[in-house]
Amino acid sequence: MYNDEVRTPQALKNRYITNVNGLKCRARRNSHSNSSNSSAASATPTNGGKENGKYSPQMSGNVCTPPPKRLHKVRNPFEGAMADRLHLPLIASPSLFRSRTPQLSSTQFEWNIDEVSQLKPADVEPHETQFHDSPDPEQESKAQLAISAFFKESLIVPSPVDCPLRKQRIILNCSEDNTPISNKSRRMRDCEVQTELTLPPILPKALEDALRPYFQPHLAGRLSGRSKSSGGPDIFNSSMRRKLFDLHNVIVLGEQDTAEPSRSMVGSSPQGKQTMFAGRLSDSASGESSFGCLSPIRNLCGLPPGTPDNGTCSGKRKLLMHELELPSPIAPSEHLSRRLVHSKVEISVTEQHDTLSERTALKFTPDRSSSPMGGGLEHSDCSINQRVRRLRVNSTRQVVIETGDQPLFEETEGEEEEAESEDDEEADAMQLSTVSFNCSSSNSDTPRGHKRHRSAQRKNLSQSFSANLEEEADQTQGGAGSIQPAEPPSVAMPQQGARIPLYRADSGFNETSSTTFAFSQDLPLDVSMACCSTPSTRS
């Protein structure tokens, strides 16, 4: 039996009323059934007639029949107590919409939903709107007044603008020994010191007592005076250049020592200080310099690389530099030619054996020949050498003309023969120097204008021969006018010796060939002959 009905007092009352009505209906049915049975028993079928009594089914209109099962209504168990719960919040059961088949054969006692919810309620969170409280304007105004009064009357943090500590400035390095900022004098510092410790003038007593035995102001004054007296050489030698170069043979000359002749080379600087390189940059025990193996200029004396310098060539270099007064390596050629007008006349025979390699080496540092200055120096050397040659020829002619009437010395036949032999040797040397110089000038970076260089070499050779012949003719005429008539000058043809093969020993991209310096080292050439160059097309 389905017993899911609500057991409340009102429900029980309604149920009781329904049960009483049901019992009344049953009693009526039973009474009607009994009366019908009695009438049926009195009317037998033997008499052959049917009696129509008032209790017959045709005549009875108040017969109560049970409703059919298809019209059975399913009642909601909450409908009975719905009216009693209208004033309460609606809390639906979690199993309200769960499909459940009733246990028809169940005879155990079960609590209904209302009783279960009261005995064992579930935790259901209420809605958020139930906890929203509306603010009270009176209480809010009171709290704001109290907060503003607290921050106005009491100072929590003082303002940093009116802080008195900002007016006090900390002065560093206020000792009397330091120079003011306006004085821009250079401060002397020792290069060997890596860390400088600066202490305030007033020290704590314990620290002052601890440092007192280590401070010696009298020695510090001597050292400072010695450092002030030491000039540029000490600073130059103690700089980083010691680590980069081997400066054992480098002498730094002051501003007053510029007139002192140097041994190897003098390089002028804009500051007026000159640096003299004595010998090579690095004279090691093995005799090989650090830069000599890379440069085609082995040495400045025209000797083989292994020959030591015994001082024979230093005198020629000193005299030549003293007479020429060579300026900076990239000086204009006009200034040098003007100085050479007065200096070339006084050069003796012993000074005329400097090769072209010496002249070139005196103009730039002994570095690699493929330096960026190499091309410009080559052209400047050509123009300078050409003008030196012309000036020498002109000056020789002038000297012969001026001294033609006054006999300076007497010549003998033996001296004339020696002069002719010297002229022949000078012609041979001129030819070799011309060939070597043209070989060095033809070894350019690109083989452009090869034919033009060959034609220029031929013209140069012919002009040098003609100039030499004119010079010899003038000399013989001047000597004949002063002493006695001499024989007509015989043309000395250059003797063709063993042909020396000229080949390039480099890769073809160096500006100066090694064969050029081979000639200059083996044969002592004349200065005037070595200065022969192409005609004045590039001047």
Swiss-Prot record:
Compositionally biased region (Low complexity): 32-43, 433-444
Keyword Cell division: yes
Record's comment on post-translational modification: Phosphorylated by aur.
Subcellular location: Cytoplasm; Nucleus
Segments of skewed composition (Acidic residues): 408-428
InterPro entries: Aurora_borealis_protein
Protein name: Protein aurora borealis
